[in-house]
Design a protein with these regions (language model features):
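Alpha-to-beta junction loops
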Residues: 26, 42-51, 118, 134-141
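Hydrophobic/proline-rich hinge and linker segments of small-molecule sensing/allosteric domains
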Residues: 69-88, 172-188
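Secondary-structure end/capping motifs
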Residues: 189-253
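Short, hydrophobic alpha-helical packing/hinge segments within bilobed ligand-binding/sensory domains
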Residues: 37-40, 128-130
Length: 268
């Protein structure tokens, strides 16, 4: 029976699985947005996936992560973006439409607002910028939609919203990277050494041909090759010590009585 691997259907994950499919029938690929794959992993419907960092933190009693994989940035992320009609410091009491695709980005926004003493109502809605901004004071988008909207800077009803990058905002508050996702599995279902080895090989290959990956992803995501290459080269894929420190800080700001010693990682 093949191992079921959850693949987030966003461009920033492409370097981790580029050319992975040709390696045979040992792996079944399951594509989805983070919220879908999070649910499937916890239900035992997939074996290993990139899981949103907040879900890894919340479900630390059930999950174990690979020790050397992450989706993280030090500073701007370019694809977790808040579009807003007035400056962020004036959003106290605002209604902010938030994407339903990722719990981590919504929690990150909540943490950042609280860090600035801002109390806003976060309203989960379908991720469509125009409808979000017509009915709310601000809108949180993630992934390829956020990247495209931030690049194009189109108007909504004749007005152009302000744009804030949450990765950059996190760095300004903490001086740490932000880890958006880690590879994780259920504690009682470790991934095979073969699968982990293939993932490491795929990452090395993808990062080694990053321009090729950017050329492949560019037309799919409707952005130029230079924009896509800059975007992909910005990510930290190895879950180094600063990325772990950022994850722990996020846990401390998000979860009461959080103890980082409860986080578990598979052997290297």
């Amino acid at each position: 029976m093949p191992e079921r691997l959850g693949i987030v259907s966003y461009a920033n994950v492409a370097p981790l699985h580029y050319r992975l499919e040709p390696w045979g029938d040992e792996i079944e690929f399951v594509y989805g947005v983070p919220s879908e794959l999070n649910r499937m992993l916890l239900a035992g419907e997939i074996d290993l996936t990139l899981i949103s960092s907040i879900e890894f933190l919340r479900w630390r009693d059930r999950l174990t992560a690979l020790p050397d994989f992450s989706i993280a940035t030090l500073g701007p992320v370019y694809s977790v973006m808040l579009f807003h009609w007035r400056p962020v410091d004036e959003l106290d009491g605002a209604r902010i439409a938030v994407t339903t695709e990722s719990a981590t980005s919504v929690q990150l926004l909540r943490v950042l607002l609280e860090g600035r003493g801002i109390n806003a109502e976060l309203v989960p809605v379908a991720p469509d910028l125009e409808s979000m901004l017509r009915e709310h004071d601000a809108a949180l988008l993630i992934g390829d939609k956020a990247l495209v909207e931030a690049v194009n800077r189109r108007t909504v009803d004749g007005r152009q919203p302000l744009v804030s990058d949450l990765g950059e905002a996190w760095y300004r508050q903490t001086r740490l990277p932000f880890t958006f996702a880690v590879w994780a599995s259920l504690k009682d279902n470790p991934p095979s050494r073969t699968l982990v080895g293939k993932l490491r090989e795929a990452r090395e290959h993808g990062l080694g041909v990053l321009h090729e990956v950017a050329c492949h992803e560019s037309p799919i995501r409707s952005v130029s090759v230079p924009v896509m290459q800059r975007y992909l080269s910005n990510f930290r894929y190895y879950f180094e010590l600063p990325d772990r420190d950022g994850l722990i800080e996020f846990g401390r700001r998000s979860i009461p009585d959080f103890d980082p010693e409860e986080l578990r990682y598979w052997p290297q």
